[in-house]
């Protein structure tokens, strides 16, 4: 019966593994300069990353970053009352899900209603924030806004 090939029987193909080049071990094999060329800084030691030969480095030429990014900032999707009047001309109760269904906003982001435009119908907005002008226009038309 033939032997089954096993992991410990595997070995690299002939010539696949070369010996590493041992530099600096005599003139016959990469001796003397060890592949670093003649003279100069890079022959003697390594320079730090970002070193430009004495020229003012890029990280010092560029301006410093000012301020900071607030990690708790809330980005609202805005909808104007004119858009509400266009999408819901009959008025009624409007939720974020209704706005998503009509394509006015994307799902998963908070919504804020702004006061650009005119309101003719009474809207009951739920789960949205509203600017002062939007709130006054909606309430003047007989509507209401709740943020919960």
UniProtKB/Swiss-Prot annotation:
Molecular function as annotated in GO: rRNA binding; structural constituent of ribosome
GO biological process, one term: translation
Domain of life: Bacteria
One GO CC term, this protein: cytosolic large ribosomal subunit
UniProt keyword annotations, A-Z: Ribonucleoprotein, Ribosomal protein, RNA-binding, rRNA-binding
SUPFAM superfamilies listed in its UniProt record: Ribosomal proteins L15p and L18e
Record carries keyword Ribosomal protein: yes
Skewed-composition ranges (Basic and acidic residues): 1-40
Residue segments, region Disordered: 1-47
InterPro entries given in the database record: Ribosomal_uL15, Ribosomal_uL15/eL18, Ribosomal_uL15/eL18_sf, Ribosomal_uL15_bac-type
NCBIfam families referenced in this protein's UniProt entry, alphabetically: rplO_bact
Functional description taken from the UniProt entry: Binds to the 23S rRNA.
Record text on subunit structure and interactions: Part of the 50S ribosomal subunit.
Family listed: Belongs to the universal ribosomal protein uL15 family.
Protein name per UniProt: Large ribosomal subunit protein uL15
Gene coding for it: rplO
């Amino acid at each position: 019966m033939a032997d089954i090939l096993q992991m410990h029987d595997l070995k690299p193909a002939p010539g696949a593994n070369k010996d590493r080049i041992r530099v600096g071990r005599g003139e016959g094999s990469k001796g003397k300069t060890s592949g670093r060329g003649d003279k100069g800084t890079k022959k003697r030691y390594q320079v730090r990353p970002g070193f430009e030969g004495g020229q003012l480095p890029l990280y010092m030429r560029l301006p410093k970053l000012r301020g900071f990014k607030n990690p708790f900032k809330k980005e609202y999707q805005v909808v104007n009352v004119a858009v509400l009047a266009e999408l819901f001309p009959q008025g009624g109760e409007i939720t974020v899900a209704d706005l998503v269904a009509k394509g006015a906003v994307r799902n998963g982001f908070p919504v804020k209603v702004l006061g650009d435009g005119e309101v003719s119908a009474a809207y009951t907005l739920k789960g949205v924030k509203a600017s002062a002008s939007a709130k006054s226009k909606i309430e003047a038309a007989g509507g209401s806004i709740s943020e919960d």
